[in-house]
Amino acid sequence: MRRKVALAFIGLFTLILISRSVSAEVDGDRLVREAVEYYRGLASISVVEMVIHRPTWERKMVIKAWTRGVSDSLFVIVAPRKDFGNGTLKKGREMWTYNPKINRVIKIPPSMMAQSWMGSDFSNNDLAKSDSILTDYVHRVVATEEHEGKKVYVVESIPKPEAPVVWGKQILKIREDAILLVEEFYDEDMKVVKRLSGYDIQMMGGKLFPKRWKMEKIGREGEYTLLEYKRLEFLDDLPEWIFTLQFLRNPKRL
């Protein structure tokens, strides 16, 4: 009996040492930055189908998106026709939305960046996969896993003091080739609220990329949003005039 207890203690102690070793050897900040930069590339143009699913209804839309660096993004709905032209521009730490029916641009304050985008389970920050996760959080590797024969780093992301975020923490699972597999969002009581999962990894835009993404609400069965990339092109750069209010308002941009 004593021998079993001793072996169990040794095993637990070994796991603790391994965990500390992983945390010491791998820079969590670097991992997260590489994952965000891999996801967005230097610049990109994409067409994405979004499906908002609820227990009693489902809504579909098609979005065209432009991104540049880790902070500039433009998203415009191209279908269905009734929503055509609704857009969101994020440039640096500022964000605007445009409604063509009333021809009005509204500036979104940082405190509202976590609000739902077009009624989906994605927030404005989620959809843009913006630099908030880089600038507002401190990251550390807490464990490792395996996915399709590749090492996966489990990263705990804690908000910096006074950061304008609503989450108590985030947990990210990043594959060794910089592909983000999972992002979990925790409230201030450290209970997981929603989970983003990337899957169906295949060649897109010249590199391996999850073609499909699912954002689901924990504990609310049947409530989730799916994203499927229909087209994805990574570029070296995009012109400045794309990320302007004039382009956001201009229906000829598509």
Residues covered by each model-derived region:
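Sec/Tat signal peptide C-region and signal peptidase I cleavage site
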Residues: 18-24
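Extended lipid/amphipathic-ligand handling interfaces
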Residues: 35, 63-67, 197-203
